[in-house]
Structures are given as C-alpha cells and as structure tokens.
Design a protein with these regions (language model features):
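Pyridoxal 5′-phosphate
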Residues: 1-243
C-alpha cells in the first residue's frame, strides 16, 4: 500500500477492483499506512491485509492479519487438524505483545479516506512538517527527491545528496554523520539493508548506477517539530560541503 523506501502510495482500490474482476485473491501489505490514521476495513477492496505493531507505536514481534470472511477458507490447512485461530494456525498467544498493540491502536488519530486512485490522509502536524521540508529544499540542486512528492506517505521523506561536484554521496556516510549528531535516519528498507545489493525499487524508478547506494529515508513522528527539521537541513548542508 505504502512503499517503505520511497514512500509511494499505491492505488489499492483500483488494483483491488481489477483483481476481483479476474477472480484473483488480493493480499495488501498495510505496514506503512496505519500509523497515519484509521480506515474502513469493510470498504477496502482486498481479501487480506497485514499490519505490524511496531510501525504504529506498538511492540516489535506482533502484527495483525485481517481476512474477509469469504477469503478465510483459503488459509485453512486441509492436511492438519487445527483448532485455534479459525483453524488457520496453532500456538500460544503472546498476551503482553497483544496488549501493547491494542493500546497503540487506541492512540491512532485521524481517518484515512480511500478512493480508486488515491489515499487521502488527514491533515496533521506530521504532514505539515513533511511539506515544510520539501518547501525548504525545492531550490537546492544538491538534494534529489526519490519517489513522488504528491502520492507519498505523509510521514515519509526520501532523497539522495549530491556533493559540491554533484556526485552522489554514499548513504552510509550521511547516516553515520547524522547519528553522531543525534538524528536517526535510514539508508534503505529493513528487508534489504543487510543484503549489500542495490535496491530494485531504486533501479526501477530510473536512478543511475552511482546513485543506487545513496538513497536516504526519513520517517517523521508526532514528537518531531519544525526546529528539528531546520537542524536537519543545516546538517544536510554540512554533508554536501563535507563529502
């Protein structure tokens, strides 16, 4: 639904409609979405939806798989007799993790509206901070945004930096520099950051070979403020001059 590296939000209702026309089961990864607001599961055009608690303030190691009633049968194991979780799986529940996830769900504010081609997120301080960042860098030729600005997760920023010679700066240098200055950012998705291979997503959006290891990902939260964005922008300029 929301791409983790470049923040792109997919037209899930349109995709879901096409899948239904072709009698295709549609599983949707909503991991990046739920922290930005609640939405109507009943109206969402998919068969399965997976969510991860740590993405909306809950504990790691617990998640949710929502299934539409008509689609649930496909998950049932026909060869083994299971008695728990609607005959889908066995296992002892991690009650502390479930309780933590439940409390985090109660803290999610705002409502997401879903249309055929767009997902409309509630206007809040996080979205305003993201727009403020993009506004401040729009004339800086040393910052190259990756992904769409308009069809993007409201808490997501991704870019690569070019030095004074307009050469891409390796992401690990920026991540380490920011870490030394008490700012936590990422150089890629958790799924692929340890593989050492360039991201297929970045390849597919047309980044050059020397840019594939330079993408930076920043996730904003409710505790962030404008002065922190300003400080981050100052450190970005130091990186441009330094590396």
């Amino acid at each position: 639904w929301g791409q983790s590296e470049i923040g792109t939000v997919q037209p899930v209702q349109f995709i879901g409609s096409k899948c239904k026309e072709l009698n295709i089961m549609f599983h949707l990864d909503g991991t990046q979405i739920l922290s930005n607001g609640i939405f109507s599961w009943k109206d969402l055009k998919c068969d399965f939806l997976s969510l991860s608690a740590h993405k909306f303030g809950g504990p790691k190691g617990i998640g949710i798989l929502l299934t539409k009633e008509k689609s649930r049968q496909i998950l049932k194991n026909k060869d083994i007799s299971l008695t728990q979780e609607f005959s889908i799986r066995q296992g002892t529940q991690a009650l502390p993790l479930i309780a933590g996830m439940y409390e985090s769900l109660k803290n999610i504010k705002g409502k997401i509206k879903i249309y055929d081609y767009i997902t409309e997120f509630p206007s809040n301080n996080i979205k305003k901070l993201k727009n403020y960042f993009f506004q401040k860098i729009k004339d800086n030729n040393h910052i190259k945004i990756t992904g769409s600005i308009n069809h993007r997760l409201p808490n997501h920023i991704s870019f690569l930096l070019l030095n004074k010679l307009f050469e891409p700066i390796r992401a690990y240098k920026i991540v380490n520099f920011m870490s030394d200055n008490k700012i936590a950012i990422s150089s890629g998705s958790a799924c692929s950051s340890s593989s050492g291979k360039p991201s297929s997503t970045l390849k597919n959006i047309g980044l050059k070979d020397d840019e594939l290891y330079s993408n930076i990902r920043v996730t904003l939260g409710s505790i962030n403020n404008k002065s922190e964005i300003d400080k981050f922008l100052e450190l970005i300029q130091i990186c441009i001059d330094k590396f």
